[in-house]
Amino acid sequence: MEPSDDACTVAAPAAETAASSSGAGGGGGGGRTKKKAAGKGGPENGKFRYRGVRQRSWGKWVAEIREPRKRSRKWLGTFATAEDAARAYDRAALLLYGPRAHLNLTAPPPLPPPPPSSAAAAAASSSSAASSTSAPPLRPLLPRPPHLHPAFHHQPFHHHLLQPQPPPPPPPLYYAATASTSTVTTTTTAPPPQLAAAAPAAVLVAAAVSSTAETQAVVATAPEDAASAAAAAAAEEEAAWGFHGGDEEDYAAALLWSEPDPWFDLFLK
């Protein structure tokens, strides 16, 4: 039995209706998926492309950085603007990676101001160093009064002049010797210091030569005069005692005088 054309016509619209309904359902599911993907993060998250910085859905910005040789991230905090979060990331990168760090901003972030106590101490130390290095003020040189003499400049010379001088050497002595038949007499004369100092050297040499010659002459004539002097002394002694050797009585009386007398010696002493 062949189907009728009316039945085929009714089945075709039914199939088209089922296909359209299924396509509409699939399109609705795809629309819900796109809406959820568009709702992640803040509205300005795609506007700023800073490393380690992202925006929350309520508008705040957060920053975090990956530590070296670790898979974990270090939380840096929440900030009001994207620039503040980027500066926080740059500071952390400099501390962790040093000069190899990749920074978000071209210029390095400014360092925090020092506390007031350390700033005051640094200012005080700088002022003290400046005061210590500064030279003391110079005083003007006043002219010296004319009636004052700088005696201290001549102190070494004055001390040299006040040193005791050695005593002058004794004056030379002149000797004159004379010889006679019985005795030899020697006289010594000392001329005044002024004459001795002024006398030339030739006079002193002549006096010494003459004195030496006279002394040698006296020594040569002394043995000859000794015998004659002894004979003369014996003759004078005999004349004084009056003894001629003729009478024995006179000879005995002469012996009395020749003996030593101890009592007489006491009186002589």
UniProtKB/Swiss-Prot annotation:
Keyword Nucleus: yes
GO biological process assignments: positive regulation of DNA-templated transcription; response to stress
Primary location group: nucleus
CDD domains per the UniProt record, alphabetical: AP2
Domain of life: Eukaryota
GO molecular function: DNA-binding transcription factor activity; transcription cis-regulatory region binding
Positions of the UniProt region annotated as Disordered: 1-53, 106-153
Alphabetical UniProt keywords: DNA-binding, Nucleus, Stress response, Transcription, Transcription regulation
Biased composition (Pro residues): 107-117
InterPro entries (UniProt xref): AP2/ERF_dom, AP2/ERF_dom_sf, DNA-bd_dom_sf
UniProt keyword DNA-binding present: yes
SUPFAM superfamilies according to UniProt: DNA-binding domain (SSF54171)
DNA-binding region boundaries: 49-106
Gene3D superfamilies in UniProt: AP2/ERF domain
Residue ranges, compositional bias (Low complexity): 11-22, 118-136
Cellular component terms per the entry's GO annotation: nucleus
Entry's localization field: Nucleus
Physiological role: Probable transcription regulator that binds to cis-responsive elements of genes involved in stress response.
Similarity annotation: Belongs to the AP2/ERF transcription factor family. ERF subfamily.
Protein name (database record): Ethylene-responsive transcription factor ABI4
Organism: Oryza sativa subsp. japonica
